[in-house]
UniProtKB/Swiss-Prot annotation:
InterPro entries: Kinase-like_dom_sf, Prot_kinase_dom, Protein_kinase_ATP_BS, Ser/Thr_kinase_AS
Organism: Danio rerio
Pfam families the record matches: Pkinase
Gene Ontology molecular function, alphabetical: ATP binding; protein serine kinase activity; protein serine/threonine kinase activity
Protein name according to UniProt: Serine/threonine-protein kinase H1 homolog
Biased composition (Low complexity): 384-396
Catalytic activity: L-seryl-[protein] + ATP = O-phospho-L-seryl-[protein] + ADP + H(+); L-threonyl-[protein] + ATP = O-phospho-L-threonyl-[protein] + ADP + H(+)
Active site, per annotation: D216
Residues where ATP binds: I102, G103, R104, G105, S106, F107, S108, R109, V110, K125
Gene assigned in the entry: pskh1
Protein backbone atom coordinates (compact mmCIF):
# COMPACT_ATOMS: atom_id res chain seq x y z
CA UNK A 1 0.00 0.00 0.00
CA UNK A 2 1.38 3.39 -0.87
CA UNK A 3 2.25 6.39 1.22
CA UNK A 4 0.49 9.38 -0.26
CA UNK A 5 2.66 11.85 1.61
CA UNK A 6 6.02 10.44 0.60
CA UNK A 7 8.13 12.02 -2.08
CA UNK A 8 9.20 9.90 -5.01
CA UNK A 9 12.87 9.59 -5.83
CA UNK A 10 13.75 10.45 -9.42
CA UNK A 11 15.01 7.68 -11.70
CA UNK A 12 18.77 7.28 -11.15
CA UNK A 13 20.77 8.93 -13.94
CA UNK A 14 22.65 6.54 -16.18
CA UNK A 15 26.01 8.23 -15.68
CA UNK A 16 26.08 7.94 -11.88
CA UNK A 17 29.07 5.88 -10.83
CA UNK A 18 29.43 3.50 -7.92
CA UNK A 19 31.54 6.02 -6.02
CA UNK A 20 28.22 7.11 -4.52
CA UNK A 21 28.78 4.17 -2.19
CA UNK A 22 31.41 5.07 0.31
CA UNK A 23 32.75 3.65 3.54
CA UNK A 24 32.98 5.76 6.67
CA UNK A 25 35.61 4.64 9.16
CA UNK A 26 34.36 3.02 12.38
CA UNK A 27 33.39 5.38 15.17
CA UNK A 28 35.01 4.68 18.55
CA UNK A 29 31.83 4.82 20.60
CA UNK A 30 28.65 2.96 19.87
CA UNK A 31 25.76 5.06 20.96
CA UNK A 32 22.42 3.29 20.98
CA UNK A 33 20.74 0.05 21.89
CA UNK A 34 17.03 0.75 22.27
CA UNK A 35 14.37 1.80 19.75
CA UNK A 36 10.88 3.13 20.12
CA UNK A 37 8.33 0.55 19.07
CA UNK A 38 5.92 2.77 17.19
CA UNK A 39 6.42 6.14 15.61
CA UNK A 40 2.86 6.69 14.44
CA UNK A 41 3.80 6.57 10.77
CA UNK A 42 2.02 3.30 10.08
CA UNK A 43 4.86 1.92 7.99
CA UNK A 44 6.67 -1.38 7.85
CA UNK A 45 9.28 -3.00 5.72
CA UNK A 46 8.31 -4.54 2.45
CA UNK A 47 9.66 -8.00 3.23
CA UNK A 48 11.70 -9.72 5.86
CA UNK A 49 15.39 -10.19 5.49
CA UNK A 50 17.44 -13.12 6.69
CA UNK A 51 17.22 -14.11 10.34
CA UNK A 52 14.68 -11.48 11.11
CA UNK A 53 16.53 -8.80 9.22
CA UNK A 54 14.13 -6.05 8.29
CA UNK A 55 14.50 -5.02 4.71
CA UNK A 56 15.81 -1.58 3.89
CA UNK A 57 13.28 -1.03 1.17
CA UNK A 58 10.12 0.08 2.89
CA UNK A 59 6.65 -1.11 2.10
CA UNK A 60 4.19 1.45 3.39
CA UNK A 61 0.90 0.25 4.82
CA UNK A 62 -1.88 1.67 6.91
CA UNK A 63 -1.11 -0.27 10.09
CA UNK A 64 -2.77 1.10 13.23
CA UNK A 65 -0.98 1.52 16.55
CA UNK A 66 -1.02 -1.51 18.85
CA UNK A 67 -4.61 -2.22 19.89
CA UNK A 68 -3.93 -2.10 23.62
CA UNK A 69 -2.11 1.23 23.52
CA UNK A 70 -3.90 4.48 24.22
CA UNK A 71 -2.88 7.51 22.12
CA UNK A 72 -0.04 9.20 23.94
CA UNK A 73 0.17 12.97 24.46
CA UNK A 74 1.93 14.88 21.67
CA UNK A 75 4.66 16.19 24.01
CA UNK A 76 5.40 12.70 25.28
CA UNK A 77 5.57 11.35 21.75
CA UNK A 78 7.90 14.15 20.63
CA UNK A 79 10.21 13.51 23.57
CA UNK A 80 10.32 9.81 22.75
CA UNK A 81 11.15 10.52 19.11
CA UNK A 82 13.82 13.04 20.11
CA UNK A 83 15.37 10.54 22.51
CA UNK A 84 15.30 7.90 19.77
CA UNK A 85 17.02 10.17 17.25
CA UNK A 86 19.67 11.15 19.77
CA UNK A 87 20.81 7.53 20.00
CA UNK A 88 21.81 7.39 16.33
CA UNK A 89 25.42 7.72 15.28
CA UNK A 90 26.03 11.49 15.00
CA UNK A 91 27.52 11.17 11.51
CA UNK A 92 24.24 9.72 10.29
CA UNK A 93 22.00 12.30 11.95
CA UNK A 94 24.23 15.12 10.72
CA UNK A 95 23.29 14.20 7.17
CA UNK A 96 19.85 12.59 7.55
CA UNK A 97 16.77 13.58 9.52
CA UNK A 98 15.33 10.46 11.17
CA UNK A 99 11.56 10.37 10.58
CA UNK A 100 10.18 7.00 11.64
CA UNK A 101 10.99 3.45 12.55
CA UNK A 102 9.51 1.42 9.69
CA UNK A 103 10.87 -2.07 10.28
CA UNK A 104 12.69 -4.24 12.72
CA UNK A 105 14.25 -7.68 12.97
CA UNK A 106 16.48 -9.76 15.20
CA UNK A 107 19.62 -7.99 14.03
CA UNK A 108 18.37 -4.88 12.26
CA UNK A 109 16.26 -1.76 12.36
CA UNK A 110 15.03 0.23 9.38
CA UNK A 111 14.12 3.91 9.54
CA UNK A 112 12.61 6.33 7.07
CA UNK A 113 14.79 9.41 6.76
CA UNK A 114 15.10 12.64 4.79
CA UNK A 115 18.36 13.98 3.44
CA UNK A 116 18.81 17.31 5.21
CA UNK A 117 20.01 19.16 2.11
CA UNK A 118 17.89 17.69 -0.69
CA UNK A 119 14.84 16.62 1.38
CA UNK A 120 14.80 13.37 -0.55
CA UNK A 121 13.39 10.38 1.37
CA UNK A 122 15.51 7.29 1.90
CA UNK A 123 15.53 4.18 4.06
CA UNK A 124 18.43 3.46 6.39
CA UNK A 125 18.95 -0.15 7.36
CA UNK A 126 21.04 -0.66 10.48
CA UNK A 127 22.50 -4.14 10.96
CA UNK A 128 24.05 -5.41 14.19
CA UNK A 129 27.32 -6.89 12.94
CA UNK A 130 28.47 -8.06 16.37
CA UNK A 131 26.34 -11.16 15.76
CA UNK A 132 27.66 -13.75 13.30
CA UNK A 133 24.43 -14.04 11.33
CA UNK A 134 24.13 -10.27 11.21
CA UNK A 135 27.63 -10.05 9.75
CA UNK A 136 26.83 -12.72 7.16
CA UNK A 137 23.71 -10.93 6.00
CA UNK A 138 25.47 -7.59 5.91
CA UNK A 139 28.40 -8.97 3.92
CA UNK A 140 26.07 -10.69 1.46
CA UNK A 141 23.95 -7.62 0.83
CA UNK A 142 26.88 -5.22 0.57
CA UNK A 143 28.76 -7.56 -1.76
CA UNK A 144 25.81 -7.43 -4.16
CA UNK A 145 24.54 -3.89 -3.74
CA UNK A 146 27.96 -2.30 -4.15
CA UNK A 147 28.21 -3.91 -7.59
CA UNK A 148 24.76 -3.38 -9.09
CA UNK A 149 23.25 -0.43 -10.89
CA UNK A 150 19.97 -1.34 -12.55
CA UNK A 151 16.58 0.33 -12.68
CA UNK A 152 14.81 -2.80 -11.41
CA UNK A 153 17.14 -3.46 -8.48
CA UNK A 154 17.12 -1.49 -5.25
CA UNK A 155 20.04 0.94 -5.04
CA UNK A 156 22.50 1.40 -2.22
CA UNK A 157 23.39 5.06 -1.87
CA UNK A 158 25.82 5.25 1.03
CA UNK A 159 27.30 3.19 3.87
CA UNK A 160 28.35 4.18 7.40
CA UNK A 161 30.17 1.74 9.67
CA UNK A 162 30.83 1.60 13.41
CA UNK A 163 32.59 -1.10 15.40
CA UNK A 164 29.37 -3.07 15.90
CA UNK A 165 26.88 -1.73 13.37
CA UNK A 166 26.53 -0.91 9.70
CA UNK A 167 24.12 1.71 8.33
CA UNK A 168 23.04 1.22 4.71
CA UNK A 169 21.34 4.20 3.08
CA UNK A 170 19.05 2.91 0.34
CA UNK A 171 16.24 3.90 -1.96
CA UNK A 172 12.83 4.03 -0.32
CA UNK A 173 10.09 2.11 -2.13
CA UNK A 174 6.63 3.40 -1.26
CA UNK A 175 4.50 1.48 -3.75
CA UNK A 176 4.02 -1.70 -1.76
CA UNK A 177 4.46 -5.37 -2.53
CA UNK A 178 3.58 -6.87 -5.90
CA UNK A 179 0.50 -8.80 -4.85
CA UNK A 180 -0.81 -6.07 -2.54
CA UNK A 181 -0.92 -3.82 -5.60
CA UNK A 182 -2.76 -6.45 -7.65
CA UNK A 183 -5.41 -6.86 -4.95
CA UNK A 184 -6.10 -3.11 -4.79
CA UNK A 185 -6.32 -2.73 -8.57
CA UNK A 186 -9.64 -2.97 -10.36
CA UNK A 187 -8.18 -4.72 -13.37
CA UNK A 188 -5.42 -7.21 -14.13
CA UNK A 189 -4.85 -8.89 -17.49
CA UNK A 190 -2.21 -11.13 -19.04
CA UNK A 191 -0.65 -8.03 -20.55
CA UNK A 192 -0.28 -6.55 -17.07
CA UNK A 193 1.40 -9.78 -15.98
CA UNK A 194 3.90 -9.63 -18.85
CA UNK A 195 4.80 -6.03 -17.94
CA UNK A 196 5.66 -7.14 -14.42
CA UNK A 197 7.62 -10.18 -15.57
CA UNK A 198 9.58 -8.18 -18.15
CA UNK A 199 10.88 -5.88 -15.43
CA UNK A 200 11.74 -8.71 -13.05
CA UNK A 201 13.40 -10.75 -15.81
CA UNK A 202 15.46 -7.73 -16.87
CA UNK A 203 16.75 -7.40 -13.32
CA UNK A 204 17.42 -11.12 -12.93
CA UNK A 205 19.23 -11.31 -16.28
CA UNK A 206 21.45 -8.42 -15.17
CA UNK A 207 22.22 -10.14 -11.86
CA UNK A 208 23.05 -13.42 -13.56
CA UNK A 209 25.33 -11.64 -16.01
CA UNK A 210 27.31 -10.39 -13.00
CA UNK A 211 27.41 -13.88 -11.49
CA UNK A 212 24.87 -13.01 -8.79
CA UNK A 213 22.15 -15.50 -7.83
CA UNK A 214 19.39 -14.06 -5.64
CA UNK A 215 18.26 -17.41 -4.17
CA UNK A 216 15.17 -15.99 -2.47
CA UNK A 217 12.99 -14.51 -5.20
CA UNK A 218 9.38 -14.29 -4.05
CA UNK A 219 6.54 -11.73 -4.22
CA UNK A 220 7.50 -10.15 -0.89
CA UNK A 221 10.86 -9.21 -2.37
CA UNK A 222 9.36 -7.47 -5.41
CA UNK A 223 8.33 -3.92 -4.51
CA UNK A 224 6.81 -1.05 -6.46
CA UNK A 225 8.91 2.09 -6.45
CA UNK A 226 5.97 4.45 -5.96
CA UNK A 227 2.15 4.23 -5.76
CA UNK A 228 1.61 5.49 -9.33
CA UNK A 229 0.27 3.26 -12.09
CA UNK A 230 3.50 3.69 -14.06
CA UNK A 231 5.77 2.58 -11.20
CA UNK A 232 8.61 0.20 -11.88
CA UNK A 233 9.16 -3.04 -9.93
CA UNK A 234 12.35 -3.43 -7.91
CA UNK A 235 14.07 -6.60 -6.72
CA UNK A 236 15.07 -6.36 -3.06
CA UNK A 237 16.56 -8.32 -0.16
CA UNK A 238 19.90 -9.87 -1.07
CA UNK A 239 20.59 -11.49 2.30
CA UNK A 240 20.72 -14.98 0.75
CA UNK A 241 22.41 -13.96 -2.50
CA UNK A 242 25.47 -15.75 -3.83
CA UNK A 243 28.15 -13.96 -5.82
CA UNK A 244 30.31 -15.73 -8.37
CA UNK A 245 32.43 -14.54 -11.28
CA UNK A 246 30.42 -16.56 -13.79
CA UNK A 247 27.01 -17.47 -12.46
CA UNK A 248 26.15 -20.07 -15.10
CA UNK A 249 29.37 -22.02 -14.63
CA UNK A 250 29.75 -21.90 -10.86
CA UNK A 251 27.92 -24.42 -8.71
CA UNK A 252 26.44 -23.57 -5.32
CA UNK A 253 25.71 -26.00 -2.50
CA UNK A 254 24.12 -24.02 0.34
CA UNK A 255 20.59 -25.17 1.13
CA UNK A 256 18.53 -22.00 1.42
CA UNK A 257 15.38 -20.32 0.18
CA UNK A 258 11.67 -20.17 0.97
CA UNK A 259 9.99 -23.61 0.84
CA UNK A 260 7.20 -22.91 -1.68
CA UNK A 261 9.66 -21.26 -4.10
CA UNK A 262 12.66 -23.55 -3.71
CA UNK A 263 13.94 -25.45 -6.74
CA UNK A 264 14.01 -29.28 -6.83
CA UNK A 265 17.79 -29.47 -7.20
CA UNK A 266 18.27 -27.62 -3.91
CA UNK A 267 15.95 -30.02 -2.08
CA UNK A 268 17.98 -33.07 -3.14
CA UNK A 269 21.22 -31.28 -2.30
CA UNK A 270 22.64 -31.31 -5.77
CA UNK A 271 25.12 -28.58 -6.71
CA UNK A 272 23.03 -25.94 -8.45
CA UNK A 273 23.32 -22.86 -10.65
CA UNK A 274 21.42 -19.59 -11.05
CA UNK A 275 18.64 -21.65 -12.68
CA UNK A 276 17.12 -21.80 -9.18
CA UNK A 277 16.07 -18.17 -9.62
CA UNK A 278 14.16 -19.10 -12.77
CA UNK A 279 12.26 -21.82 -10.93
CA UNK A 280 11.20 -19.25 -8.34
CA UNK A 281 10.09 -16.93 -11.16
CA UNK A 282 8.00 -19.78 -12.53
CA UNK A 283 6.22 -20.06 -9.19
CA UNK A 284 5.72 -16.28 -9.13
CA UNK A 285 4.34 -16.35 -12.69
CA UNK A 286 1.85 -19.06 -11.73
CA UNK A 287 0.63 -17.03 -8.75
CA UNK A 288 0.57 -13.86 -10.84
CA UNK A 289 -1.96 -15.39 -13.24
CA UNK A 290 -4.10 -17.24 -10.72
CA UNK A 291 -3.59 -16.05 -7.17
CA UNK A 292 -2.81 -19.64 -6.16
CA UNK A 293 0.38 -21.63 -5.56
CA UNK A 294 1.51 -24.38 -7.96
CA UNK A 295 2.88 -26.35 -5.00
CA UNK A 296 1.33 -26.00 -1.56
CA UNK A 297 0.80 -28.24 1.43
CA UNK A 298 0.88 -27.59 5.17
CA UNK A 299 2.87 -30.80 5.52
CA UNK A 300 6.42 -29.92 4.54
CA UNK A 301 7.40 -33.38 3.31
CA UNK A 302 4.37 -33.58 1.03
CA UNK A 303 5.16 -30.09 -0.28
CA UNK A 304 8.73 -31.12 -1.09
CA UNK A 305 7.55 -34.26 -2.87
CA UNK A 306 5.21 -32.14 -5.00
CA UNK A 307 8.12 -29.91 -5.97
CA UNK A 308 10.38 -32.86 -6.79
CA UNK A 309 7.71 -34.31 -9.10
CA UNK A 310 7.11 -30.90 -10.65
CA UNK A 311 3.43 -31.68 -11.14
CA UNK A 312 0.91 -28.85 -10.97
CA UNK A 313 -2.40 -28.18 -12.67
CA UNK A 314 -4.09 -25.41 -14.60
CA UNK A 315 -7.51 -26.17 -13.14
CA UNK A 316 -9.91 -23.84 -11.38
CA UNK A 317 -10.52 -20.15 -11.93
CA UNK A 318 -9.17 -18.21 -13.72
CA UNK A 319 -7.12 -20.78 -15.70
CA UNK A 320 -9.80 -21.44 -18.39
CA UNK A 321 -9.40 -17.76 -19.35
CA UNK A 322 -5.58 -17.86 -19.44
CA UNK A 323 -3.92 -18.32 -22.84
CA UNK A 324 -2.02 -21.44 -23.86
CA UNK A 325 1.01 -19.25 -24.54
CA UNK A 326 1.05 -18.08 -20.92
CA UNK A 327 0.76 -21.68 -19.73
CA UNK A 328 3.61 -22.66 -22.06
CA UNK A 329 5.79 -19.97 -20.49
CA UNK A 330 5.11 -21.37 -17.02
CA UNK A 331 5.79 -24.93 -18.20
CA UNK A 332 9.18 -23.90 -19.57
CA UNK A 333 10.37 -22.29 -16.33
CA UNK A 334 8.77 -24.78 -13.93
CA UNK A 335 10.88 -27.58 -15.40
CA UNK A 336 12.40 -30.00 -12.90
CA UNK A 337 15.57 -30.46 -14.96
CA UNK A 338 17.53 -27.20 -14.55
CA UNK A 339 19.31 -27.82 -17.85
CA UNK A 340 15.96 -27.68 -19.66
CA UNK A 341 14.71 -24.63 -17.75
CA UNK A 342 14.62 -21.29 -19.55
CA UNK A 343 17.34 -18.82 -18.59
CA UNK A 344 16.39 -15.20 -17.92
CA UNK A 345 17.56 -14.22 -21.40
CA UNK A 346 15.57 -17.02 -23.02
CA UNK A 347 12.49 -16.18 -20.97
CA UNK A 348 12.63 -12.58 -22.21
CA UNK A 349 12.49 -13.96 -25.77
CA UNK A 350 9.48 -16.20 -25.14
CA UNK A 351 6.61 -15.19 -27.50
CA UNK A 352 4.25 -14.49 -24.61
CA UNK A 353 6.68 -12.00 -23.07
CA UNK A 354 7.89 -10.48 -26.36
CA UNK A 355 4.35 -9.84 -27.62
CA UNK A 356 3.19 -8.71 -24.17
CA UNK A 357 0.36 -11.23 -24.51
CA UNK A 358 -0.86 -9.52 -27.69
CA UNK A 359 -2.53 -12.69 -28.94
CA UNK A 360 -4.07 -13.46 -25.55
CA UNK A 361 -7.47 -12.54 -24.29
CA UNK A 362 -7.61 -9.18 -22.59
CA UNK A 363 -10.13 -10.57 -20.15
CA UNK A 364 -9.93 -9.03 -16.70
CA UNK A 365 -8.59 -11.74 -14.38
CA UNK A 366 -8.60 -9.48 -11.35
CA UNK A 367 -11.62 -10.85 -9.52
CA UNK A 368 -10.45 -14.47 -9.47
CA UNK A 369 -6.81 -13.58 -8.75
CA UNK A 370 -7.60 -11.17 -5.92
CA UNK A 371 -10.12 -13.55 -4.35
CA UNK A 372 -7.59 -16.39 -4.43
CA UNK A 373 -4.84 -14.18 -3.01
CA UNK A 374 -7.07 -12.94 -0.19
CA UNK A 375 -8.28 -16.46 0.56
CA UNK A 376 -4.71 -17.69 0.82
CA UNK A 377 -3.65 -14.71 2.95
CA UNK A 378 -6.55 -15.35 5.30
CA UNK A 379 -5.68 -19.02 5.72
CA UNK A 380 -2.02 -18.15 6.32
CA UNK A 381 -2.96 -15.66 9.02
CA UNK A 382 -4.30 -18.57 11.08
CA UNK A 383 -1.07 -20.50 10.69
CA UNK A 384 2.45 -19.84 11.91
CA UNK A 385 3.73 -21.20 8.60
CA UNK A 386 3.99 -17.92 6.74
CA UNK A 387 6.34 -17.72 3.75
CA UNK A 388 9.58 -16.63 5.33
CA UNK A 389 13.15 -17.21 4.22
CA UNK A 390 15.29 -19.88 5.80
CA UNK A 391 17.16 -17.21 7.72
CA UNK A 392 14.29 -14.75 8.14
CA UNK A 393 11.02 -14.12 9.90
CA UNK A 394 8.81 -11.47 11.36
CA UNK A 395 8.84 -13.49 14.55
CA UNK A 396 10.86 -16.28 16.07
CA UNK A 397 7.86 -18.59 15.94
CA UNK A 398 7.22 -18.15 12.22
CA UNK A 399 10.95 -18.35 11.50
CA UNK A 400 11.17 -21.79 13.05
CA UNK A 401 8.03 -22.88 11.24
CA UNK A 402 9.28 -21.86 7.79
CA UNK A 403 12.92 -22.90 8.06
CA UNK A 404 14.21 -25.59 5.73
CA UNK A 405 14.70 -28.15 8.45
CA UNK A 406 17.83 -30.23 8.17
CA UNK A 407 16.14 -33.38 9.47
CA UNK A 408 13.38 -33.15 6.87
CA UNK A 409 15.84 -32.64 4.04
CA UNK A 410 17.94 -35.61 5.12
CA UNK A 411 14.86 -37.82 5.09
CA UNK A 412 13.72 -36.40 1.75
CA UNK A 413 17.15 -36.98 0.24
CA UNK A 414 17.26 -40.56 1.59
CA UNK A 415 13.92 -41.38 -0.02
CA UNK A 416 14.96 -39.71 -3.26
CA UNK A 417 18.15 -41.78 -3.43
CA UNK A 418 16.17 -44.96 -2.76
CA UNK A 419 13.85 -44.18 -5.67
CA UNK A 420 16.78 -43.40 -7.97
CA UNK A 421 18.48 -46.68 -7.07
CA UNK A 422 15.31 -48.61 -7.79
Amino acid sequence: MGCRTSKVLPEPPGDVQLDLVKKVEPHQTDVYKNFIKYDGGGEKTGSPSPQGQSQAVAKVSQSPPPANDQPEPADSHRKKVAKYRAKFDPRVTAKYDIKALIGRGSFSRVVRVEHRSTRQPYAIKMIETRYREGREVCESELCVLRRVRHTNIIQLMEVFETAERVYMVMELATGGELFDRIITRGSFTERDATRVLQMVLDGVKYLHTLGITHRDLKPENLLYYHPGADSKIMITDFGLASTRKKGDECLMKTTCGTPEYIAPEILVRKPYTNAVDMWALGVISYILLSGTMPFEDDNRMRLYRQILKGKYSFSGEPWPSVSNLAKDFIDRVLTVDPNERLSAGQALKHPWIVSMAASSSMKNLHRSISQNLLKRASSRCHSTKSSQSTRSSRSTKSSKARRLREKELRELNRRYQQQCNG
